[in-house]
C-alpha cells in the first residue's frame, strides 16, 4: 500500500552539527521525476503487484510491468524527450521487487541518457530503525549501484533523496549520525537530500525538498494555486541557502481510490492548468532543481505518464518549461 506525507515539515533540532557538504549556488540545473518500479502483471512477473490496490487513472498503455524492458525503454525515452534529466526511484528494501528491477533501470537510463537516484523511503530495520542499521543499508546500496555511470551526482558525489518517513523514524539527530558515518565510510562522500523544508534540515543535509505540496494546493482554484506557489516557492529556495534548492510541481493529486480516511487532500488538474501554473512559478523561483511528482505514482493520481483519462497532456507540456529552466 502506498503512503505519502503531504508536506514535509519536521521540527528542527537545536545543536545539530553540520555533516553535509557545502555547495555554491552556481550548479547545473536538473529536472527530476519520481519513479515507481513496483508495478507487476501476470504476463511478465506471474502476478499482479500494486495495480489491485487502487489507481486514480488507467495507464494509456495498460497495466504494465516494471520488469518489462520494452516498457522501461518506452518510459525513459518519453521522459528524455520531455526534457526530464533524471528519475528518483522509490527504494524500500534489499532484494524486493523494486531492487530486482534496478539493473534494468540503470542500463536503460544509460542507453537513453538519463540520470538515476533513489528515494530512500524507510530507515532500517523496519520494526525498530536505528542509525547503525540505516548506515549499513545505505552503504550497501551505494557500493552496489552508485558507481554506475548514470547515477546522479552533485559536486562529484552520488545523490540520495531521503523521504520524510525515513527522516521521522530517526529524527534529525539520528540522521546526523547516519550522514557523518556514511560520509566517513564511503570514499568521496554522499550528497543527501532531505524531504523537509526547514533551516535545521538545510544545515544538516546537502539539499532540501518537499515530495508533494498537495496539502497546500488541495481544493484550490488555478488562481489560488498560482498565488500559493508564487508566495511559497521562493521561500523554499531561500531556506535552502547555499545547499541544493528544489521546487516540486504536480499535475494534480487524487488518492481517493486507496480507502484512506477522509477528507482527502485532492488537487484538481484543472484541465492541465495546475501543472502549467506550478511550472511557471517554479521556473520563476530559480531553484537549482525542479522535481516532478510524479512520473507514475498511479495510486495517488499524480502521474504525468499518459493515461486514458488525461492523455499525454501534462507530458506534452513538460518540454516547454524544462527547456526554459535548463537553458
Protein language model annotation of sequence segments:
Residues 5-24:
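N-terminal export signals
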Amino acid at each position: 500500500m502506498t503512503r505519502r506525507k503531504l508536506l514535509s515539515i519536521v521540527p528542527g533540532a537545536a545543536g545539530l552539527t553540520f555533516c553535509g557538504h557545502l555547495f555554491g549556488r552556481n550548479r547545473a540545473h536538473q529536472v527530476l521525476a519520481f519513479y515507481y518500479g513496483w508495478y507487476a502483471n501476470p504476463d511478465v512477473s506471474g502476478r499482479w503487484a500494486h495495480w489491485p490496490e487502487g489507481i486514480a487513472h488507467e495507464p494509456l498503455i495498460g497495466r504494465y510491468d516494471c520488469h518489462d524492458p520494452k516498457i522501461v525503454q518506452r518510459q525513459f525515452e518519453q521522459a528524455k524527450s520531455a526534457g526530464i534529466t533524471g528519475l528518483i526511484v522509490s527504494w524500500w528494501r534489499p532484494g524486493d521487487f523494486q531492487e530486482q528491477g534496478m539493473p534494468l533501470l540503470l542500463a536503460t537510463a544509460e542507453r537513453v541518457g538519463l540520470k538515476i537516484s533513489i528515494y530512500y523511503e524507510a530507515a532500517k530495520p523496519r520494526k525498530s530503525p536505528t542509525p547503525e542499521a540505516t548506515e549499513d543499508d545505505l552503504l550497501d546500496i551505494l557500493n552496489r549501484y552508485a558507481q554506475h555511470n548514470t547515477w546522479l551526482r552533485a559536486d562529484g558525489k552520488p545523490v540520495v533523496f531521503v523521504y520524510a518517513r525515513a527522516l521521522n523514524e530517526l529524527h534529525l539527530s539520528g540522521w546526523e549520525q547516519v550522514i557523518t558515518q556514511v560520509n566517513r565510510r564511503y570514499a568521496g562522500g554522499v550528497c543527501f537530500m532531505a524531504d523537509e523544508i526547514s533551516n535545521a534540515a538545510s544545515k544538516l543535509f546537502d539539499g532540501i525538498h518537499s515530495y508533494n505540496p498537495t496539502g497546500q494546493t488541495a481544493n484550490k482554484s488555478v488562481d489560488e494555486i498560482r498565488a500559493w506557489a508564487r508566495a511559497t516557492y521562493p521561500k523554499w529556495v531561500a531556506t535552502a541557502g547555499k545547499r541544493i534548492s528544489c521546487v516540486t510541481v504536480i499535475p494534480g493529486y487524487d488518492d481517493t481510490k486507496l480507502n484512506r480516511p477522509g477528507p482527502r487532500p485532492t488537487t484538481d488538474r484543472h484541465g492541465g492548468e495546475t501543472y502549467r501554473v506550478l511550472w511557471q512559478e517554479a521556473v520563476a523561483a530559480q531553484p537549482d532543481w525542479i522535481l516532478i511528482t510524479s512520473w507514475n505514482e498511479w495510486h495517488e493520481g499524480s502521474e504525468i505518464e499518459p493515461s486514458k483519462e488525461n492523455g499525454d497532456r501534462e507530458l506534452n507540456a513538460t518540454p516547454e518549461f524544462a527547456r526554459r529552466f535548463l537553458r
